[in-house]
Amino acid sequence: LVYIPFWRPDIERPESIVGEGWRFYGFGRLLRHLPERSIKPAPKNERRELKQRIRQRLSRAGANEVLTYSFVHGRVLKNSEQDPGRAYRLSNALSPDLQYYRISILPSLLDKVHANIKSGHDEFMLFEIGKIHDKKLGFNDENLPIEKTFIDGVYANKKPKAGAPFYKVRKIAERLMKDLSVEVDFVKIAESDSDVPAPFDAKRSAWIVAKNGDNLGIVGELVSSARRNFKLPDYTAAFSIDIEKLQENLSKNQGYNYQPLSRFPSTARDISLKMDSNVDYAKVYACAEEVAKKHGELQMSITPIAIYQPKNNDSTKTVTLNVKFTSAERTLEDKDIAPIIEEIAAMAAEEFDAAQV
């Protein structure tokens, strides 16, 4: 124990006692360098890095990020066909326009589309990363409402283009997943599925499903009532992705998908398959992809070209795919490619009675 004499009232803290010890020992005998200490960089925040990567990818695709309030008016919920009863209502709202916690981000984005079109922007895409609160999610261990993080986006074009807007947004979502090295499938929504979030149209939407079966989100067009309520153009589609589930699948796919460019030229072939009109395009693509996996020595990319259906015969359709071949060892010849095209045609004929035309 150390006792402080009564004539030293200046010693009040433990640091003063240490200073006295060094005074007796001699300050001149102190080592002239700083004491060693372990310095570690701050750990990376994986969630923050994922959000930044998403922002960069969507910005490169031409999308614009917006920030909106987490509180919305009840009118916004009703216009998007959402149930206000699922939203938490504030007892001391700052204004009537900020009464409810939003249960999804998409309505906040839809509310901004018409104003941008009136400002002269005919074609654009908006996205936002934010949190949602839904009574269906329940409470956490601290008895607080569970909040989830989503990335929602909407594409709008005042001047309609050929084809459906679904494919435009799906292409953007598909590219985003590919850049993040997350393999997904776009699965058709069953008629009996009642979990389709408003305001998506179940008949014109698809689930975004990871390879392990996790439902990451949804991409598709909106119901006509929501388009009418928000004064949206007909050529409008959107997507909504759960960032927490996306991060879980991202951690399982940490490997890089980089492949060095081949020194040899690529070559491509088209294949047209005539089949029953009830056969889904996804089955045709999966058939070609399965054949491609058997030939791992080649880099093969499959791109849809067209789906043709005669006006006078709606019982059949013709699907055309473009298959691109690349070898890292040599220049490919027709004798290398023709058997693979024939193999795709044979598998399609076996699985859904398709004929090569």
What feature does the model see in each segment?
Residues 1-124, 324-326, 331, 336-357:
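Extended, well-folded interaction surfaces typified by the phenylalanyl-tRNA synthetase beta subunit core
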Residues 1-5, 35-41, 68-80, 125-135, ...:
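A glycine-rich phosphate-binding loop feature that marks nucleotide/adenosyl-phosphate handling sites
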Residues 4-6, 92, 131, 155, ...:
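Flexible glycine-/small-residue-rich
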Residues 10, 14, 68, 146, ...:
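A carboxyl-terminal module marker
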Residues 15, 128-129, 138, 218-220:
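Beta-strand scaffold of nucleotide-dependent catalytic cores
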Residues 25-40, 86-91, 132-160, 260-270, ...:
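Residues forming anionic-ligand binding surfaces in small-molecule and nucleic-acid pockets
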Residues 27, 60, 111, 115, ...:
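Short, well-ordered loop/turn and helix-capping segments at boundaries between secondary-structure elements
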Residues 115-118, 140-143, 196, 228:
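A generic local secondary-structure boundary/capping motif
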